[in-house]
Amino acid sequence: MEEVLDILVVGAGPTGLACAIEAVLGNFSVLVVEKGCLVNSLFSYPPGMTFFTTRERLEIGNIPFNSVNVKPTRAEALEYYRGVTESYHLPVHYQERVVGVAGTDGNFEVHANTADGEQKCYRARKVVVATGYYDIPNLIGIPGEDLPKVSHYYGEAHAFYQRKVAVIGGANSAAIAALDLFRHGAQVTIIHAEAELSRHIKYWIRPDIENRIKEGSIRAYMESTVKEITPDSIWFENAQGERTRIENDYVYALTGYHPDFDFLRHIGVEVDPRTSRPNCNTKTRQSNVPGIYLAGVVISGRHTNEIFIENGRFHGKQIIADISKHLGARPSKNRGGEQTDPSQ
């Protein structure tokens, strides 16, 4: 007979891994299913990125994050989460996208498609959705947004030396990208719909970007909305309705991201039409669908600046505590005196 897992976790980001660790510590059988690679969103960050937070706030599973820097780098974070996954022997299936969840509490069927088109089905008593939000950008919805020269994800600046680059947006990621591009010799223009840059820009970045704009090193058009992108230009309109065209080689539309609301609705989770917040118990993290739990930024709707790794990593404890009440205690799976918790 096909194995029935106690818990299936959708998503192998830091929050999903933290949930899987709590399941292991509770002696539950668990599987993590991930559409990409381990901590896929972190892997997609710019290669030279440094986190804004300290290493202690990225730790999961009581395993110390050893870093030579107070604020760790992307490379250090990738190494850390690989190490955590190995330490807890977490079972993770990669390149499998979960496309549906059928059944009822205690008897779910989780359907997934592999990268090469194979269809898989897993059975699980409980399901935890920790899919993050970085995969779905907030589209502007204008002509030309689908051109090859437009990207919603910032990478490296070198390729844009002496090129005309527009950065759409005024939040933290837009400010960082604009500064990096400028320092690598690009001709940078910021186009932002609001009158001022976002208040969420980090305090040590704000003076830098504001001074570069003030001195004219980076052009900025505030209260301006992009209307069209063409192969060699970008059109935008200011608050007075005046249209402007500037020559352009590349566009970074850094207008934010959001969770996969369609997937949540597809598996039966109610999503508030106004805030896009899913129906989720704040104490247990269980959704309106009994047996389906939500963890991490996926519960924040469009308010994605509320939940980060720093606080989402604790959702696993809440979830497994509630699952334990329903499934009961599990006997220890330690073998040969080996510790289940590698941090011990």
Model-derived segments and spans:
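FAD-binding core/adjacent interface of flavoenzyme oxidoreductases
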Residues: 1-10, 25, 40, 44, ...
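Beta1-alpha1 glycine-rich phosphate/pyrophosphate-binding loop at the start
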Residues: 2, 12-90, 175, 179-204, ...
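Rossmann-like dinucleotide/flavin-binding elements
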Residues: 2-5, 9-35, 153-198, 283-331
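Short, glycine/charged-enriched secondary-structure capping and boundary segments
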Residues: 23, 45-49, 107, 141-145, ...
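A Rossmann-like FAD-binding core segment of flavoenzymes
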Residues: 89-112, 121-124, 183-275, 331-341
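Glycine/Thr-rich phosphate-binding loops of Rossmann-like dinucleotide-binding domains
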Residues: 137-138, 198, 261-262, 302-303
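Iron-sulfur (Fe-S) cluster-binding modules
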Residues: 344
